[in-house]
Amino acid sequence: MEIPSFNALIQKSIVDHWDMDALTDYKGATLQYHDVARKIEKLHIMFENSGVVKGDKIALCGRNSANWAVAFLATLTYGAIAVPILHEFMPDQIHNIVNHSDAKLLFVGDVVATQIDATKMPDLEGIIYIPDYSLVVSRTDKLTYAREHLNEMFGIKYPKYFRKNHVNYYMEQNPDELAMINYTSGTTGFSKGVMVPYRALWGNADFAEDVLGKKIKPGDSIISILPMAHMYGMAFEFIFEFIKGCHIFYLTRIPSPAIIAEAFGRIKP
């Protein structure tokens, strides 16, 4: 069976659902699919101008949020390799995963940003704050310049409007090409990295389409509860729904029973 490009599915969904709601932080802002595309493009510009090349590793560690999802999609559609890290991990575990994976950049959430020690990750070129993509740490002039002049560079590249036809993502050349490295919880010492090819991401989406495809349609509201840094949550509460054109809500905090009940009452997923 011929396996289509996973990134082509992401690109098609963004273009097909351009003016529909895509990602919402519960009780916060909503990004439509065209907003996601715009943010992805800005991150691509920052990656390119800071020296990130295809195949470089980019780690992400933070609670579920719209900006986490955008950073993950930007990583894959640029051709870099994503390294999602569970935000519940202890700082030493996070340091070890970043170092072991040879990550060049690290995206961090608000809590993780206060817990990690950049000096324990000496090969990182930069740490980026997920809520606004500002720089927590920059160790290269190119990264600093790229972030400080990001809006200017975006305006030069797209002087009038950013349109559907500008969405042109990296397409993996082989389904066995490495897409991400997913680290286990480390029940016997430090976490172990699992190499996840693009075909695995596509395969999960294809399985979900077979099982849920007739029940979930574009525009449906979905609440994401499981961590996206975990393969199950990523595959079945994020990637499949994004490809379908759904509207995904993130609680952005610990999903207690009270919060879940309130969110279900308001969103009616």
Tell me the role of every PLM-derived stretch.
Residues 56-57, 63-83, 87-91, 99-105, ...:
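A short helix-loop-beta submotif of the ANL/AMP-binding
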Residues 9-32, 188:
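AMP-dependent adenylate-forming
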Residues 9, 50, 77-156:
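Structural core segment of the AMP-binding/adenylate-forming
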Residues 2, 21-73, 90-95, 198:
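Conserved AMP-binding/adenylate-forming core of the ANL superfamily
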Residues 18-19, 147-183, 190, 215-221:
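Conserved pre-ATP/AMP-binding loop-to-beta segment of ANL
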Residues 11, 44, 94-95, 170, ...:
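Short hydrophobic/charged patches on amphipathic alpha-helices used for structural packing
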Residues 37-42, 163, 175, 194-215:
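Conserved structural elements of the adenylate-forming
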Residues 202-221, 228-269:
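Conserved AMP-binding/adenylation subdomain of ANL enzymes
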